[in-house]
Amino acid sequence: QFGNICVRAGWTIEMVFHEGDSLAVRERAWKVIDLFVEAVGAEKLAIWWGMAPVAMASEKGKARIEKHKPSTLNNPKGFAMMFDLASGSPKPPDDWVENAQEFRLYCRIKNNEGIWLHDRHTTPGIGPSMSFIRMAFPAWWIMDQPPERNVGRLTTQIVELMQPYWAIAGWGVMPAVEERNIGPDGKGQQILYPYLQRFPGLNALGSLALMSHDFNNAMYSINWLSFVSDALLEKLGGREAVRKQIEASQYLSAGDVGNCLGVRAGDFPGLGDMEQGLTLPA
């Protein structure tokens, strides 16, 4: 209708965590990023790090990582770790056309000043802002993976490496690197709304939402796979109490994944299509 692609649907993984200004968290984050690049292939990716994108496998791309990565580890409290990886042309002819990439990794880990900005200066006691890594893979790639590299195994590896506060994974939509067209001025919300009504199995979260201080207290979004850390499970009676509730459910199953209790909502999900009367199971 508007001639622009503002998101692509695919397999999405969202991880939210604290202490983004610590060396331990930065080291875990780089392991996750390395796993993503290994799974996708550096030759398919471009990197955005504070300036115009360049091909990741190019000399400029390698130089950009070699320049910034040491700072994220040597000075984690003072140096933010905020960049994007995405497939497609590093220099598309128009920012507004065909700019939602198939493969995406969005890393937003602030420095100490950014994490505590609101708590120190505007809303004392609100706590730290969250750090997050989110990523997306196209459906065709998911279906092409052999059993030993299926998306469930990849998701489990990523959660085990990152040890998040909480995480979700399943079918969803991932914004383009240029997220401005998701807002009302860019017409992205108007485009998305009917599609999200038609396909009820798609999870949709804006990246800014993942920074919410509300996530200090609870996770407000779930997906087919949800991973909940002990800090949140304690608010619900503890890991074993929650596990017992899940085991009593007809649809849910649970298992330990790293520092989290992983919760699976039924069999591998299809996508309902309301126009064809294909609703999802309750």
Regions found by a protein language model. Give the residues of each.
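C-terminal interaction module
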Residues: 1-55, 176-282
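Internal, hydrophobic cores of structured domains that mediate oligomerization or house catalytic pockets
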Residues: 48-183
